[in-house]
Amino acid sequence: MKIVVMMKQVANKDAILRINKEGTWIEEGDLSFEVSESDGYALEEALRVKEKLGGEVVVCSMGPQRVKSVIKDALARGADRAIHVVGDNLGQLSPYAAATALVAAIRDETPDLILTGLQSDDYGYGQTGVIMAELLGMPHATIAIEVDASGDKLRVKRELESGWYQWYSMPLPALLTIQSGISQIRYATLKGIMAAKKKEIKEVTPAAETVNRPTHQRIEKIYLPQKTKQTQLLGNGDAKAGAAELAQKLHAEARVF
Protein backbone atom coordinates (compact mmCIF):
# COMPACT_ATOMS: atom_id res chain seq x y z
CA MET A 1 0.00 0.00 0.00
CA LYS A 2 1.30 3.44 -0.93
CA ILE A 3 0.43 6.10 1.63
CA VAL A 4 1.07 9.81 1.11
CA VAL A 5 1.15 12.04 4.19
CA MET A 6 0.77 15.80 3.88
CA MET A 7 2.83 17.68 6.48
CA LYS A 8 2.94 21.41 7.18
CA GLN A 9 5.61 23.38 9.00
CA VAL A 10 4.29 25.98 11.46
CA ALA A 11 5.74 28.30 14.09
CA ASN A 12 6.73 26.65 17.36
CA LYS A 13 3.95 26.76 19.94
CA ASP A 14 6.25 28.37 22.52
CA ALA A 15 7.47 31.10 20.19
CA ILE A 16 6.90 34.75 21.06
CA LEU A 17 4.82 36.09 18.19
CA ARG A 18 5.10 39.56 16.71
CA ILE A 19 2.69 40.88 14.09
CA ASN A 20 4.18 42.24 10.88
CA LYS A 21 3.88 45.92 10.00
CA GLU A 22 1.04 45.25 7.55
CA GLY A 23 -0.95 43.58 10.33
CA THR A 24 -1.71 40.59 8.13
CA TRP A 25 0.58 37.89 9.57
CA ILE A 26 3.40 37.30 12.03
CA GLU A 27 7.07 38.13 11.62
CA GLU A 28 8.75 34.82 10.80
CA GLY A 29 12.38 35.91 10.64
CA ASP A 30 13.45 34.92 14.16
CA LEU A 31 10.99 32.09 14.80
CA SER A 32 11.69 28.42 15.30
CA PHE A 33 9.45 25.97 13.48
CA GLU A 34 7.95 22.52 13.93
CA VAL A 35 5.45 20.22 12.26
CA SER A 36 1.76 21.02 12.73
CA GLU A 37 0.54 18.76 15.53
CA SER A 38 -2.19 16.81 13.75
CA ASP A 39 0.10 16.23 10.76
CA GLY A 40 2.51 14.46 13.11
CA TYR A 41 -0.30 12.13 14.13
CA ALA A 42 -1.15 11.56 10.45
CA LEU A 43 2.43 10.38 9.88
CA GLU A 44 2.28 8.05 12.86
CA GLU A 45 -0.96 6.51 11.59
CA ALA A 46 0.60 6.01 8.16
CA LEU A 47 3.60 4.23 9.68
CA ARG A 48 1.30 1.94 11.66
CA VAL A 49 -0.69 1.02 8.55
CA LYS A 50 2.57 0.32 6.73
CA GLU A 51 3.74 -1.93 9.56
CA LYS A 52 0.48 -3.86 9.32
CA LEU A 53 0.08 -4.14 5.54
CA GLY A 54 3.49 -3.31 4.11
CA GLY A 55 4.10 -0.76 1.40
CA GLU A 56 5.58 2.72 1.28
CA VAL A 57 5.07 6.02 3.10
CA VAL A 58 5.76 9.19 1.14
CA VAL A 59 5.63 12.57 2.89
CA CYS A 60 4.84 15.80 1.06
CA SER A 61 5.40 19.30 2.41
CA MET A 62 5.17 22.74 0.88
CA GLY A 63 7.18 25.87 1.63
CA PRO A 64 10.69 27.38 1.63
CA GLN A 65 13.91 25.48 2.22
CA ARG A 66 13.45 25.56 6.00
CA VAL A 67 10.64 23.01 5.50
CA LYS A 68 13.41 20.45 4.96
CA SER A 69 13.69 20.11 8.76
CA VAL A 70 10.12 18.77 8.97
CA ILE A 71 10.74 16.46 6.01
CA LYS A 72 13.98 15.07 7.44
CA ASP A 73 12.33 14.42 10.79
CA ALA A 74 9.54 12.49 9.05
CA LEU A 75 12.11 10.44 7.14
CA ALA A 76 13.95 9.74 10.39
CA ARG A 77 10.72 8.50 11.99
CA GLY A 78 10.21 5.97 9.22
CA ALA A 79 8.86 7.57 6.04
CA ASP A 80 10.51 6.15 2.92
CA ARG A 81 10.92 9.25 0.77
CA ALA A 82 9.61 12.78 0.41
CA ILE A 83 8.30 15.39 -2.00
CA HIS A 84 9.07 19.05 -1.31
CA VAL A 85 6.92 21.64 -3.10
CA VAL A 86 9.35 24.55 -3.01
CA GLY A 87 8.39 28.22 -2.79
CA ASP A 88 8.88 31.15 -0.43
CA ASN A 89 5.29 32.38 -0.05
CA LEU A 90 3.30 29.17 -0.44
CA GLY A 91 2.18 29.21 3.18
CA GLN A 92 -0.05 32.17 2.36
CA LEU A 93 -2.01 30.39 -0.38
CA SER A 94 -5.74 29.93 0.04
CA PRO A 95 -6.86 26.39 0.90
CA TYR A 96 -8.00 25.82 -2.69
CA ALA A 97 -4.72 27.03 -4.20
CA ALA A 98 -2.70 25.02 -1.68
CA ALA A 99 -4.74 21.89 -2.41
CA THR A 100 -4.28 22.40 -6.15
CA ALA A 101 -0.50 22.68 -5.79
CA LEU A 102 -0.30 19.63 -3.52
CA VAL A 103 -2.49 17.50 -5.80
CA ALA A 104 -0.26 18.38 -8.76
CA ALA A 105 2.78 17.28 -6.76
CA ILE A 106 1.42 13.88 -5.71
CA ARG A 107 -0.94 12.90 -8.54
CA ASP A 108 1.64 10.74 -10.34
CA GLU A 109 2.23 8.79 -7.13
CA THR A 110 -1.25 7.23 -7.50
CA PRO A 111 -1.51 6.69 -3.71
CA ASP A 112 -3.85 4.17 -2.15
CA LEU A 113 -4.31 6.35 0.92
CA ILE A 114 -3.69 10.03 1.65
CA LEU A 115 -3.50 11.26 5.24
CA THR A 116 -3.51 14.87 6.37
CA GLY A 117 -3.89 16.52 9.74
CA LEU A 118 -7.37 17.72 10.65
CA GLN A 119 -6.24 21.36 10.50
CA SER A 120 -3.01 23.30 10.69
CA ASP A 121 -1.88 24.98 13.89
CA ASP A 122 -1.53 28.37 12.20
CA TYR A 123 -4.48 29.18 9.93
CA GLY A 124 -6.67 26.33 11.16
CA TYR A 125 -8.83 26.28 8.02
CA GLY A 126 -9.39 22.51 8.06
CA GLN A 127 -10.19 22.66 4.32
CA THR A 128 -7.09 21.68 2.36
CA GLY A 129 -7.37 17.92 2.82
CA VAL A 130 -11.05 17.81 1.89
CA ILE A 131 -10.46 19.95 -1.21
CA MET A 132 -7.62 17.62 -2.24
CA ALA A 133 -9.98 14.66 -2.01
CA GLU A 134 -12.54 16.42 -4.20
CA LEU A 135 -9.91 17.36 -6.80
CA LEU A 136 -8.72 13.74 -6.90
CA GLY A 137 -12.22 12.29 -6.91
CA MET A 138 -11.54 10.28 -3.75
CA PRO A 139 -13.90 9.37 -0.93
CA HIS A 140 -12.86 11.06 2.28
CA ALA A 141 -13.58 11.22 5.99
CA THR A 142 -12.65 13.92 8.50
CA ILE A 143 -11.77 13.98 12.21
CA ALA A 144 -10.55 10.37 12.12
CA ILE A 145 -9.60 8.96 15.53
CA GLU A 146 -9.22 5.30 14.58
CA VAL A 147 -8.25 3.67 11.29
CA ASP A 148 -8.65 0.00 10.42
CA ALA A 149 -7.12 -0.66 7.00
CA SER A 150 -7.32 -3.91 5.06
CA GLY A 151 -6.37 -4.80 1.50
CA ASP A 152 -8.88 -2.72 -0.44
CA LYS A 153 -11.02 -0.89 2.10
CA LEU A 154 -11.02 1.17 5.27
CA ARG A 155 -13.05 1.34 8.44
CA VAL A 156 -12.74 4.75 10.04
CA LYS A 157 -13.98 6.01 13.40
CA ARG A 158 -14.89 9.70 13.34
CA GLU A 159 -15.24 12.01 16.31
CA LEU A 160 -18.53 13.89 16.46
CA GLU A 161 -19.89 16.37 19.01
CA SER A 162 -21.01 15.70 22.58
CA GLY A 163 -19.07 12.46 22.93
CA TRP A 164 -20.63 10.78 19.90
CA TYR A 165 -18.65 8.74 17.35
CA GLN A 166 -19.37 7.41 13.88
CA TRP A 167 -17.92 4.45 11.96
CA TYR A 168 -17.43 4.74 8.21
CA SER A 169 -16.52 2.07 5.66
CA MET A 170 -15.03 3.21 2.37
CA PRO A 171 -13.10 1.78 -0.58
CA LEU A 172 -9.54 2.67 -1.46
CA PRO A 173 -8.07 4.95 -2.67
CA ALA A 174 -9.29 7.41 -0.05
CA LEU A 175 -8.25 10.46 1.97
CA LEU A 176 -8.53 10.92 5.74
CA THR A 177 -7.95 13.96 7.94
CA ILE A 178 -6.52 12.82 11.26
CA GLN A 179 -7.39 14.20 14.69
CA SER A 180 -4.61 14.91 17.20
CA GLY A 181 -4.20 12.30 19.92
CA ILE A 182 -5.17 9.32 17.75
CA SER A 183 -2.07 7.42 18.90
CA GLN A 184 1.30 7.77 20.62
CA ILE A 185 3.80 9.45 18.29
CA ARG A 186 7.17 7.70 18.02
CA TYR A 187 10.48 9.52 18.27
CA ALA A 188 13.20 9.34 15.67
CA THR A 189 15.96 6.91 16.64
CA LEU A 190 19.66 7.41 15.93
CA LYS A 191 19.42 4.64 13.35
CA GLY A 192 16.47 6.41 11.75
CA ILE A 193 18.29 9.74 11.68
CA MET A 194 21.28 8.17 9.95
CA ALA A 195 19.06 6.33 7.46
CA ALA A 196 17.17 9.53 6.63
CA LYS A 197 20.32 11.06 5.15
CA LYS A 198 20.17 8.54 2.29
CA LYS A 199 16.47 8.87 1.53
CA GLU A 200 15.20 10.75 -1.50
CA ILE A 201 13.74 14.25 -1.21
CA LYS A 202 12.27 15.22 -4.57
CA GLU A 203 11.86 18.96 -5.15
CA VAL A 204 9.06 20.26 -7.37
CA THR A 205 7.94 23.79 -8.21
CA PRO A 206 4.24 24.62 -8.38
CA ALA A 207 2.84 25.98 -11.62
CA ALA A 208 2.72 29.77 -11.82
CA GLU A 209 -1.01 29.74 -12.54
CA THR A 210 -1.57 27.84 -9.30
CA VAL A 211 0.43 30.25 -7.16
CA ASN A 212 -0.89 33.38 -8.84
CA ARG A 213 -4.54 32.36 -9.23
CA PRO A 214 -7.07 34.89 -7.91
CA THR A 215 -8.13 34.15 -4.37
CA HIS A 216 -11.65 34.54 -3.03
CA GLN A 217 -10.49 35.28 0.48
CA ARG A 218 -7.85 37.37 2.17
CA ILE A 219 -6.78 38.16 5.71
CA GLU A 220 -7.77 41.72 6.54
CA LYS A 221 -6.12 41.89 9.95
CA ILE A 222 -4.69 39.76 12.71
CA TYR A 223 -4.19 40.95 16.27
CA LEU A 224 -3.41 39.74 19.75
CA PRO A 225 -6.48 39.45 21.99
CA GLN A 226 -6.82 42.22 24.53
CA LYS A 227 -6.72 41.26 28.18
CA THR A 228 -10.04 42.23 29.71
CA LYS A 229 -9.69 40.49 33.08
CA GLN A 230 -7.07 40.44 35.78
CA THR A 231 -6.56 38.50 38.99
CA GLN A 232 -5.93 40.32 42.25
CA LEU A 233 -4.92 38.65 45.51
CA LEU A 234 -6.83 40.04 48.49
CA GLY A 235 -5.80 40.03 52.12
CA ASN A 236 -2.22 38.91 51.50
CA GLY A 237 -3.05 35.38 52.65
CA ASP A 238 -5.20 36.38 55.63
CA ALA A 239 -8.80 35.17 55.25
CA LYS A 240 -10.42 37.83 57.45
CA ALA A 241 -8.52 40.66 55.84
CA GLY A 242 -9.34 39.25 52.41
CA ALA A 243 -13.04 39.05 53.25
CA ALA A 244 -13.07 42.62 54.49
CA GLU A 245 -11.26 43.87 51.41
CA LEU A 246 -13.62 41.93 49.15
CA ALA A 247 -16.65 43.44 50.90
CA GLN A 248 -15.20 46.90 50.47
CA LYS A 249 -14.59 46.36 46.73
CA LEU A 250 -18.07 44.92 46.19
CA HIS A 251 -19.50 48.02 47.83
CA ALA A 252 -17.26 50.68 46.30
CA GLU A 253 -16.51 49.26 42.84
CA ALA A 254 -19.21 46.72 41.97
CA ARG A 255 -21.88 48.56 44.01
CA VAL A 256 -23.49 45.27 45.01
CA PHE A 257 -24.55 46.64 48.39
Where are the language model's segments positioned?
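N-terminal glycine-rich FAD/FM-binding segment characteristic of electron-transfer flavoproteins
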Residues: 1-257
